[in-house]
Amino acid sequence: MSNTPYNSSVPSIASMTQSSVSRSPNMHTATTPGANTSSNSPPLHMSSDSSKIKRKRNRIPLSCTICRKRKVKCDKLRPHCQQCTKTGVAHLCHYMEQTWAEEAEKELLKDNELKKLRERVKSLEKTLSKVHSSPSSNSLKSYNIPESSNLFMGSDEHTTLVNANTGSASSASHMHQQQQQQQQQEQQQDFSRSANANANSSSLSISNKYDNDELDLTKDFDLLHIKSNGTIHLGATHWLSIMKGDPYLKLLWGHIFAMREKLNEWYYQKNSYSKLKSSKCPINHAQAPPSAAAAATRKCPVDHSAFSSGMVAPKEETPLPRKCPVDHTMFSSGMIPPREDTSSQKRCPVDHTMYSAGMMPPKDETPSPFSTKAMIDHNKHTMNPPQSKCPVDHRNYMKDYPSDMANSSSNPASRCPIDHSSMKNTAALPASTHNTIPHHQPQSGSHARSHPAQNRKHDSYMTESEVLATLCEMLPPKRVIALFIEKFFKHLYPAIPILDEQNFKNHMNQMLSLSSMNPTVNNFGMSMPSSSTLENQPITQINLPKLSDSCNLGILIIILRLTWLSIPSNSCEVDLGEESGSFLVPNESSNMSASALTSMAKEESLLLKHETPVEALELCQKYLIKFDELSSISNNNVNLTTVQFAIFYNFYMKSASNDLTTLTNTNNTGMANPGHDSESHQILLSNITQMAFSCGLHRDPDNFPQLNATIPATSQDVSNNGSKKANPSTNPTLNNNMSAATTNSSSRSGSADSRSGSNPVNKKENQVSIERFKHTWRKIWYYIVSMDVNQSLSLGSPRLLRNLRDFSDTKLPSASRIDYVRDIKELIIVKNFTLFFQIDLCIIAVLNHILNVSLARSVRKFELDSLINLLKNLTYGTENVNDVVSSLINKGLLPTSEGGSVDSNNDEIYGLPKLPDILNHGQHNQNLYADGRNTSSSDIDKKLDLPHESTTRALFFSKHMTIRMLLYLLNYILFTHYEPMGSEDPGTNILAKEYAQEALNFAMDGYRNCMIFFNNIRNTNSLFDYMNVILSYPCLDIGHRSLQFIVCLILRAKCGPLTGMRESSIITNGTSSGFNSSVEDEDVKVKQESSDELKKDDFMKDVNLDSGDSLAEILMSRMLLFQKLTKQLSKKYNYAIRMNKSTGFFVSLLDTPSKKSDSKSGGSSFMLGNWKHPKVSNMSGFLAGDKDQLQKCPVYQDALGFVSPTGANEGSAPMQGMSLQGSTARMGGTQLPPIRSYKPITYTSSNLRRMNETGEAEAKRRRFNDGYIDNNSNNDIPRGISPKPSNGLSSVQPLLSSFSMNQLNGGTIPTVPSLTNITSQMGALPSLDRITTNQINLPDPSRDEAFDNSIKQMTPMTSAFMNANTTIPSSTLNGNMNMNGAGTANTDTSANGSALSTLTSPQGSDLASNSATQYKPDLEDFLMQNSNFNGLMINPSSLVEVVGGYNDPNNLGRNDAVDFLPVDNVEIDGLVDFYRADFPIWE
């Protein structure tokens, strides 16, 4: 760059230097400006021609970078010039630091630091006076205010320092000033209170009353996921924590899990009467008969001993005959010789773990060997590689082969006994959309040829030459690679800005010779000819002269893969129907010319044809980088490039989760997406952090002068630790010209000689290289800090890098002395780093109060309120991010050791824009950082075309979503804390409702932003161009969190209070025509009117909690739209499957029952044999697991707790699982935590009327198997009453069925209790061990004699209910009669004068021992008894869907869909020893 335009400014520099020296007496004096400049320049070169270097000064420009880029005159005003303000880029106005002004800057920093200390002392004094003036100040403990207390204890020292600098050293004057300040503050507080008393007197008094309330967040929102291979802690910010924090959801899960157990009992009774056939082979050999020669000497390869007597064989009338997958004609004399002496040790070559209990699926379900669906080993819960499509376990089969037969390739049957021809027909069949996730197949011919080469070497070791040859076939052509790199740095680079663009392109040019196609072009790719010969020029050789080049190759593969996935044409199509127009944002296509749009479309079409397969990354990281060894064994080869690859690898695993099936070997099949909730990311991030410590990234590079001498020698590899092999022709200089790599060896040696310092031009280039290396150093460190904060926020785990300034002094990237005039987009990256770090500091303040045990154990309400107010000011744009961070520090909410003091010289203009400005930026050419003035047309013409501006705004959009998600979480925590306190302290009802409304507003905001993102990702030149992969999971996760709160509110709106309002039985003695047709028609009419109103509902508006009866319907409409979205996204993203299952689960569960359809269909509609819910399919995978599987689900562990299986193992009585226990200790179980009885914030006076009408409309008769119906009774007896709280708390159990009343022979008598009603004493949890494996004989209610005898055995029940005219008083409905979730009755003697303390088991009755009578339960009767949850009438069909089927042998191991709750069915090591202990092992 020419220096001519700046020669006139030389005298001004000298004059400014002299004036600055005179102003700063502490600065070093200098005689001449030249001497001063040379003294401040790095002493790199001490040669004889030093005088020449002094005459050619290293001058720093005074104009701002933007004006120099636009080549206009700059007025040099601070903090931003007028030209940048007029053009609308004032936030980017940047001045390079002058070397002569360093000492003056230090003095200014000291003044700013003193000013901040004064403000901080005042704020702390105000906070402490507020705490001491509260009524609860006497009980205040030191650990309750760790930050404020510690800071105030040190405030004397700070105050003394302030007074010493201002000239007041007297302690008496210090105390006098402090008292005056306190008096002034008290006067201001009194004045503010009196001024606001008239407006909000009630809210202020309530807020002041409860400000010092303490919350314990260490127990209410913590989960421990117990797996077979360990435990995983999930903190308060994890998406599953809401399952534990909400009492309604906890009770609902308890009800569902107990229902699952009862349904298993029903299934067992149904299946226990079927005849077991153990002598028949489950394989139908008639379809594939063996040859005559083989039939005489060979046996079926299936081990028939594996089929025990307890496994059900296929019936004769099976419509789809099973065909043995083994072709018995293929077994020649040399294949699988029979072992006559060890016949019991023979193993079937068929991998039966792919099927259920050894039974082969029908032909239409046979997996195709050519399909991409991953095979799941349900016995081990591991994800097998997608290549193992053949059902034969080749590991067991090949070891019995002779070597010559195993290597034979002439006959396919000699390798595998499977007749693959019978399976080819199924390859063309379309896979179901909800089971198969389509993987993008490579479309180029070279890629298709690379897969067999990779598969042949997949299980064996590959040499480096073989790996490189395979990668050459997998990589796209050279021109396509250059286009991919340009697309990445243009669109995706701001999301992971840890590379130096020039340096990386130089590496790629050396490794792949990309510039050989067109040596005259400096930046490859964009200006190259588009001829077909250049497009198809393949990669023939990959040069890896250094160890770090392998990591650079891995980074390149990740860039190619991520960029291809992020092309807008590859994004998922989303059609939200009529609501699509509500979520559209203006695009920027109108600002581009038609030729630019056409050129962009051609480039994208070219890139779509060349996909880099994911196997290329697997080969590189396994054989070339050997990343597993580097990250776990040794750090000998760890350098800066290795850290960069590890960060890219982590970023790729989180973004492109569909590729994880071949990249990871996790055992986390319980989660739908192992890429986002897996603990493997925690381990990888910890490895990255340790690598950074090993490389010294936590220390600023200015602390190491030796970097100035070593970087030029190894500038191409910025942190190379050695050369893999001698290559003297390698150019080691960091040359920006692409043609440097094509020069001959003599020019390279000459360039190497130039490092001696004889050429001043090269010295300047080396100094620039040093600064760029230090810049990359700082960017990598702060990106790791941001990764740590994001992981802690996502998983609720503690941060690894706490109190950053205690061990790190690395400066922000803005401290780098780099001239950005040639790289404006790097200037945007630098400013983003500063802004995002400040936002991370705000997030850290929230995480400290929620996740840190020392703070979360006794966090106070006013601290959470302060965090809420500051975050609201930040996201609404009412306060600058610098002011927010300063307020957090002054209020003691953020310690300075976290890094707040590093931002003392931040640019106050560059802040977080408002969300509406971000979304509407493309409309009317609005300025992103407008200051309120109208912009003229001439200014718009001068506006600088900023690179990757849409990507930066998309990142701003994601920051807004994160901040508002935190606001939702904080309001939700306070809401769940104060809502149960309303029954004891009515003043908290106002607080609870305010927090609930705020939580709902922010939840709806996250819901809308999620819809906006996915509704605009396919629009051309939209805000989210090329961000569909990177931001998909964060946006969908926030939308999923929002829906969880919607479920909580729907439960409150439909269930009513937890005191048991309308907890009467829905089972009456009426006939099938007993429905009130007028009530039903009225309900249908009201529902139709509400649906018409919902069609007119604006999804962009907030929902009011005072909506009344329509609240549940409004929220349900949001759930249905989100379910529609996740169903469409499930075709592309694996993690959307889990969220679709979760949403469909609650939609199916909370859907209003259809009474007419249920009454017409009868009992057959509920039979589970061939029934499937029309909305959700295969929902009940996690609930169909066995006992061990459920006990390791964190939701089950929290809802029901652990139950020791001692009861099931003691004795062998058939009814031992249902016998009465003497005490809770004998069961070895723990109790549910006490839950307060209270009314929800959505409860209104109309809830009682609505629930009464619902209960009457839902009333149905009880049907017996013999069709007996009695129409003479209209009594409605409650089947489950909430227990009365004895001390203000009640252990509310899931309200299951206990007894339904029928009038038989003129008297009111109880029916035979269900199996689960006969359990332990009051308060014991229902145990999963009651599911027995023996045949159970129960009395048949259809036989009058047997039924009468069973009634005679129940004398305690008849003493209370024999009178037909007896009605239960209202006091009983209010909780005087207690019935736990197991069904045991316990009434209050003060209420009705009688007590039901015991219940006689049918086991001791005469009829129980009568084998001639057997009880056959009816499923419809069973479902109707258990469809009431705390007044919420759950659809019985939904119960069938969500609870699932019995684990009979026909369904063992089946898992057709991915679950949304983490489960595991293998015992964890170490816990099995505690199963028989006398103390509880949970909580």
From Swiss-Prot:
For binding Zn(2+) 1, which residues are annotated in this chain's numbering? Answer: 64, 67, 74, 81
Annotated Polar residues bias? 1-50, 162-176, 432-447, 706-734, 1388-1411
DNA-binding residues (ranges): 64-93
**Where does the record place a coiled coil?**
105-134
Q: In Gene Ontology terms, what is one molecular function of this protein?
A: RNA polymerase II cis-regulatory region sequence-specific DNA binding
Keyword check for Hydrolase: no
Where are the HRM-type repeats located?
Answer: 280-285, 299-304, 323-328, 347-352, 389-394, 415-420, 1192-1197
Q: Where is this region: Heme-responsive?
A: 244-444
Write the record's keywords in alphabetical order, separated by commas.
Activator, Coiled coil, DNA-binding, Heme, Iron, Metal-binding, Nucleus, Repeat, Transcription, Transcription regulation, Zinc
Chain intervals with Low complexity compositional bias? 177-208, 735-759
Q: Where in the cell is it found?
A: Nucleus
Q: Write out the residues that bind Zn(2+) 2.
A: 64, 81, 84, 93
Q: What is its main location?
A: nucleus
Can you supply a Gene Ontology BP term from the record? DNA-templated transcription
Q: Where is this region: Disordered?
A: 1-56, 162-208, 432-458, 706-767, 1384-1411
* CDD domains hit by this protein: fungal_TF_MHR, GAL4, ZIP_Hap1
One GO cellular component from the entry? nucleus
What functional role does this protein have? Regulation of oxygen dependent gene expression. It modulates the expression of Iso-1 (CYP1) and Iso-2 (CYP3) cytochrome c. In response to heme, promotes transcription of genes encoding functions required for respiration, controlling oxidative damage and repression of anaerobic genes. Binds to the sequence 5'-CGGNNNTNNCGG-3'.
Subunit notes for this chain?
Answer: Binds DNA as a homodimer. Interacts with SRO9 and YDJ1. In the absence of heme, binds to at least four cellular proteins, including YDJ1 and SRO9, forming a high-molecular-weight complex (HMC) which results in repression of its activity and dictates its DNA-binding specificity.
Misc remark for this entry? Answer: Heme is an effector molecule for CYP1/HAP1. The repeat region (see FT table) mediates heme induction by masking the DNA-binding domain in the absence of inducer.
| Name of the protein this chain belongs to | Heme-responsive zinc finger transcription factor HAP1
| Species of origin | Saccharomyces cerevisiae (strain YJM789)
Q: What gene, per UniProt, encodes this protein?
A: HAP1
